[in-house]
């Protein structure tokens, strides 16, 4: 249990592993993320916090490989469970052709991923459902049972009134790093950017960019169809600004 908790704390970027006296390992809240969430929403009650945790999980390729590949590299928006497993398997083999994949572990990982985002009707009867399906309110995955056929898994675009513009801006700025600008194309196609992480299509991305531009966080140059995006001086300390409104 302790190892499992430690794993998820690191996979969600909430803690960094340190070594103390005699090399003993311990967990410390991450400076720019874990501490901010602990100070502002330690029980993860805010929907924006859950979107942030989802982003950190999906962008952690080392500790959450299945999540990373599913959201970033599988481009299909609907698939059977079998096709999902085969897609993840092939992507892993593309990275390391010699890697020995356990079919059981792969199936368990894919089941865990779907379960994280989609609550079955029977699960909803359990008041502790959020512990089973912590990201079910994000609206990123749904599942449909068709009689006589395999169940279908869908990647879905979250409702605009759920995914806050400042959460979107945080992910944009986190991906921007030291660069001075980005493009709509980058936001749509780049690994770990808002298009892949939140299943956002071009229209929805433009919706958020227009709002962030109108509120002064971004400057957009649409000359010659380049759609280049520049952050303004307001686009700093995004998490502090987000949580100050709660």
Protein language model annotation of sequence segments:
Residues 1-246:
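Donor-sugar nucleotide-binding helix/loop cap in glycosyltransferases
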């Amino acid at each position: 249990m302790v190892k499992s908790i430690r794993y998820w704390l690191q996979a969600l970027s909430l803690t960094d592993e340190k070594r103390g006296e005699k090399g003993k390992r311990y967990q410390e809240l991450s400076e720019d993320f874990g501490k901010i969430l602990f100070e502002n929403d330690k029980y993860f009650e805010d929907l924006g916090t859950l979107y942030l945790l989802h982003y950190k999980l999906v962008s952690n390729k080392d500790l959450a490989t299945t999540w990373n590949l599913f959201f970033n590299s599988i481009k299909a928006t609907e698939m059977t469970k079998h096709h999902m497993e085969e897609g993840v398997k092939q992507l892993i083999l593309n990275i390391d052709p010699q890697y020995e994949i356990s079919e059981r572990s792969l199936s368990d990982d894919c089941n865990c991923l779907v379960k994280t985002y989609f609550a079955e009707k029977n699960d909803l009867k359990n008041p502790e459902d959020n512990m089973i399906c912590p990201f079910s309110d994000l609206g990123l995955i749904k599942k449909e049972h068709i009689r006589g056929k395999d169940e279908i898994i869908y990647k879905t675009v979250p409702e605009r009134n759920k995914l806050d513009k400042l959460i979107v801006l945080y992910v944009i700025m986190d991906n921007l790093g030291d660069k001075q600008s980005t493009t709509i194309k980058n936001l749509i196609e780049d690994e770990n950017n808002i298009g892949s992480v939140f299943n956002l299509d071009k229209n929805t991305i433009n919706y958020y960019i227009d709002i962030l531009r109108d509120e002064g966080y971004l400057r957009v140059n649409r000359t010659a169809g380049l759609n280049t995006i520049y952050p303004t001086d307001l686009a700093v300390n995004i998490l502090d600004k987000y949580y100050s409104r709660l």
